[in-house]
Amino acid sequence: MNLNRRGFLFGSAAATAVAATAQNCCKLGTRKLAAGEKANVAMIGLGIQGRTALLPQFLAQYDIGAKVTVCCDCDKERREDGAKRVNDFYSKKGIPSACKAVADFRDVLKDPMIDMVCIATPDHWHAYIAVEAMKAGKDVYCEKPLTFSIDEARKVIAAQKKYGRVFQTGSMQRSWPVFRTAAMIVRNGLIGDIKYVDANYGRGGQKLGGPSHPIRFFDDPKNAATESAPNPNVDWDMWLGPAKWRAYSDQLAPRGVNKFYPMFWRFDDDFGTGYNGDWGAHHLDIAQWGIDMDDSGPYKIIRSDEPYSTDLYHGGRRQFGMKMIFKSKKDGSDIELYHGPFGTWGTVFYGTKGVVAVNRGKIAVWEGEVGKPTAEIRQALADMKPVAGLTVVAASVGKDYGTDSSDKKDDRLTATIKTLSDKYQLETASVQLYKSPNQVENFVKCYFTRMPTISPAEVGGRGSILCGLCNMSYVYDTGFGWDPVKMDFPEGCSCRKMGISLKREFCRNGWEVVV
């Protein structure tokens, strides 16, 4: 097993300097592994994401040194099902396994034999468990969005710096070749200076999907999380955790091992962060990567002027159209990031010499300039129709979704990525972005090398802040100033005068995040 730095970490001079600093902060694990011993992984949260997306990936890391030994969930059926899946997987490979099913994550964090945890709970639990895990000396993989609130994002960032743990945010698109290719073209200035960026997600307020921002569902009886007969297999008080007490609901916590998606809790403002925290956490993350803002953020938020939604399910609020304005690190000029509904492309970068558009399983590059993009231009790009002033360089648009390895399985996409890499000489470009084969594999390798991951706490935390700023703009129907250094409202900001808080509205005693 060769886990040296050059084997999987690549960066520009600036990125290398940051990595070196981060390396010094990654302390050793709390226990020393014997020769041939595996690092023990605890899965916390065995819903559809933890069970079907993350557990198989962690099981696949056995050969590089990690073994799942605990499945933790406050739902008895889910944790026992998870433990059985683990034992069955290892048994088929002739590997001894006695995976434990644990009800309370606090018991997991007290266990000195656990080396790393994977957190795949609903959003409202992420920050508390992540910080407590780091305090306990565990390395942490946490699903996106990293946090429920902006204040929690600041605390998770501070906790990683304080406790020096290896930390990975589950923003797995960064580990996909198609997204890295797009970001490499942008970061190397190959389409000129970036002036505008689109992040497209959500349903534009249509009845087809949930709201961009979480809402108070009890305000709409037809869509409320209705009371249900108590589920004897769920510790409901633990499921609620820091959120307000409410009666058990089958909609919030569907019974047993199921395939229910999208999760109802995602759009309830006591538990989730809406589409901004769901898909926004992916496409805003790629925008953040492409414009080199992993350690910064916008300085101004501009209110949407799109129509209000007309149904209570979307809160009667605007669903897209807000903008975030960043200062370019190159020359201080403005970069406008727009939240749009033009769904073909997750992230679109508009430069002075071209356009790059990317999504899962698809990428397109045009040369030329369109200036400030209009709705007509955005729709034409989404439909792959001609746009005056632009010439297609290369495009592959035949596939919507896939796994981390999907890029390798789609021959058309692989060919397009190679065409772009060759044309723009990306392998020898001056800016080399972190190259990760897989988000989980990268995390496990970093456990052994003590190197920073591709999506450490600051990257994930900054991304969560973008999601939170989007939600704030829609919920309060406002624009405002932002201090990206302090990660706070600037003095005199209208939000301060309105009494808007960066903290969660309510937190039950005992579950406050304390660094």
Please provide the spans of the model-predicted regions.
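A contiguous active-site-proximal alpha/beta segment in oxidoreductase catalytic domains
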Residues: 139-141, 147-233, 237-238
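Rossmann-like dinucleotide-binding domain that binds NAD(P)(H)
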Residues: 227-332
